[in-house]
Amino acid sequence: MTADPQTTAVIKKVATNGIRVICEHIPTVRSVAAGVWCCTGSVAEPPALNGISHLIEHMFFKGTERRTAAEIAAEIDGVGGALDAFTEKENISFFAHVLYEHLPLALDLLSDILLKATFPREEFVKEKNVVAEEIRLYEDSPDEKIHDLVMGVLRPGEAIGMPVLGSFETLKAIGRDDALRYRNEIFTADRIVIAAAGYVDPEEFIAMVEDYFAAVPGPVGATSRKAAAPPISQPACVKDTEQTHLCVAVPAIPFGHPDRYVLAALTTVLGGNASSRLFQKVREDRGLAYAVYAYGRGFHDSGALVAYAGTSPATALETRDIVLEQFADLAAHKIGADELKRTRDFLKGTLMLSLESTAARMGRNARHEIYMGRHVSLEETLAGVDAVTADDVLRVAGEIFSNQPAVVAIGPNADAVVGA
């Protein structure tokens, strides 16, 4: 059998307790990636407890009623697997990657940390210190921090702009009881998607999920988290850095919008690869930056297109102006036939290459369920990319670049970059 991704099948079933189960059987591999996704992230947090989702993610691995933290690590290491987690604006996910014969162990571990994590008091104090160091690392990494900053400026006073890590102040305010209470509130069956991709029988996987995750509770009483608005982000952060880091962003479209393939093409043309306009004009033609790129972010009800560059303070204004010029040019002129073909082929090629990873497939399937409520096949995606026209790109560019761009900067002359 060839390794054609189109020969695989994606099965969805709703478990008895309401958990959505997504499974993709891939006959050409011998591993399985399985993930538990909670459709709640930092965007749902009370502003005073910003960062609590990320802290809970850490605490899941610090011991359960059956296993110590060391035993959790030893069991997954003992089969050559991987166990990890991440927190985003709208999701929390923890996942395992193992050989197919060890899938029962992976699900046992995932269900154990979800249902039986104890959040030991001494570990809770220690882990808050670990997260504080993570925040310090983040504060010392302007090329990372600026991407949260730009969302806060683009959506002022809205939760989507809150950092996933929280702040020193909010981290200090989070108590163990807060974390346990919030964990119990958000990790309910109606918010959970469990996905797997790899050498796994869908019916067997669904049966195992029914068994291992049967105790996941149903929804609890809804709690309003809109009482307080997060603080307004400031667009300029003056800091003694070697470079000035800048982002220019505009509001875009939600994850599942019909124009999502058009936006992907527009973003690619702008700054998605080494042949993109920003890379060529900023780096290759003028040598102004090493890192320069653009990306799109799609959420449930909003999105953003963001361009980033890190450059010398002396050339930050010039770099910013090039970005704005490219926004204007794409809104006013059609891209050429060769540029369109290259962009389509790039999007299709990078997608096909990513599908060689079971973890990437698992995540793709989970996100489609979370944001669109259905599976989006490879054939549908490829057809969507092929259907993008130069007129489409011009139309979407005109729509989103007509918005006032948010300009943010971190560096010695950040005020000038933002205000000039």
Q: Where do the PLM segments sit?
A:
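Histidine-centered active-site/metal-ligand motif
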Residues: H54, H58, H147, H245
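M16/MPP (pitrilysin/insulinase) zinc-metallopeptidase core fold and M16-derived inactive scaffolds
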Residues: A33-H97, V269-L288, F299
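Charge-rich, well-structured scaffold segments of protease-associated domains
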Residues: A9, V14, H25, A69-S224, ...
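His/Glu-based metal-binding/catalytic segments typifying zinc-dependent metallopeptidases
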Residues: I26, G35-W37, G221-R277
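Short, charged, low-complexity patches
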Residues: E45, L49, L103, L107, ...
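N- or domain-start disorder-to-order transition segments that initiate the globular core
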Residues: M1-S31
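Small-molecule pocket liners
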Residues: A34, I192, Q243-L246, G303-L305
